[in-house]
Each structure stands twice: as C-alpha cells, then as structure tokens.
Amino acid sequence: MGGAKNRLLRAVCMAGDNAGMHAAEPSLSLEIARTAARLVVEDGLELGRAKRRALQQLGASVGTPLPDNKRVEEAIREHIALFCADTQPGELRALRTLALEWMERMQDFRPHLGGAVWQGTATRHSDICLQLFCDDPKSAEIALIDQGVSYRFATVRGLHGQPVEALTIALHSAEWGECVGLHLLIYDHDDLRGALRAGSDGRAPRGGTQAVRKLLLEPPT
C-alpha cells in the first residue's frame, strides 16, 4: 500500500513539474514519446521499433512525424521515475555487472557498452549491447566457437547506418529466472575513434571496461 501511495505521489509531483516543460509540445508527439517509453521500459523494445509500435497503438497515420530519440529518452526516464523507481536501479546494476563480465571475457576485441544499459535507463526487459572493435571481423566469432558459446548470427544497422554483423547470445539470469539478450556488434578497429566522440549533449555514447567498472562503483541513485 505504501509503495503504491509513494508512486502516486511521485506521479502527481512530476506531472506538475513537467507541465510547463511540455506545454508547447504537440500533444500527439508527446503521446507517441510516452507510449514508446512505456514499450521500451516494459517490453524491452529498441527506440525505433518502440516509436513505430506507438504509432500503431495510438492509431496515428504512418506519415505522422515521430519524436526524436532524445525526447523519447526523456520520457523513458520520466516513466522509470514514476513507475519503477524502486526496482530499476537494482536491475540496471545487475545488467551492468553481467555486461562487465562479458566485456572482460571479450577484452581482446576492445568491447564498449552502449544502449540503455550504458545510458542508465535499462530494466530487466532490456538487452545488453556490446560493440567490439576487431582487427579481424571473424576473430570474435571464432572466440565464441572456441569457448563453446552458442549464438545467432544477424546483420543489423551499425553506428553510421552501415550493415554490421551481430552475434546474439541468450544469457540465463539465475536472479530473474529468465534469459537476457546479449548482442555483440562487430566493427573494424578503425571505427573505434569516431565511436567515442561525445554527442550533442556532451555525453559519451558508449564506454569501455574501465568506464563500466567506474559506474558500478557509484552508489545507486
């Protein structure tokens, strides 16, 4: 009862705090962002797919302008603060710990953590995305074979829109009794320099092993 009451109070307070912030935002764009945020947090969808699914759920036309990723990420943080502030920090820490284990395991391939687990918006429904920067594009795949690790192969959209190879592993979480998806995206070593350039908001879009260790040393927020 107390937890539900606290969530309700947070919702009321945040609604008031955000009213002015979003006053000039078109209502449909705001609804798309909020619906997409819910789909990301509760169903583990990636941003692009979540926005398209939100369009369908809201009955909007295919040509409706979509909110940018930054706006959806803001809505994700709002959704987490309203509905899962009690559980999300622990789930995020568990995912970052699992990511670090695999970064250390794949250390020869310059692993970098990206996506929601790096940004701090992941929940137990989120996948882990590691980007590997390899001298030989087949070397990471060979390493998995040598370790007896089962994986699925796919081609996905890369950092600059180019097709890249992705190796997907289903990791079992004893804590949650379910699988967590781990995606290893294979890049050329020369792609690493541009991949570390900060975004327009000044934040690093991904981090290496030392950066993830540092995150795990920080107290939960």
Please provide the spans of the model-predicted regions.
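Coiled-coil-like amphipathic alpha-helices with heptad-repeat character
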Residues: 2-5, 46
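Leucine-biased recognition of intrinsically disordered, low-complexity hydrophobic segments
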Residues: 8-9
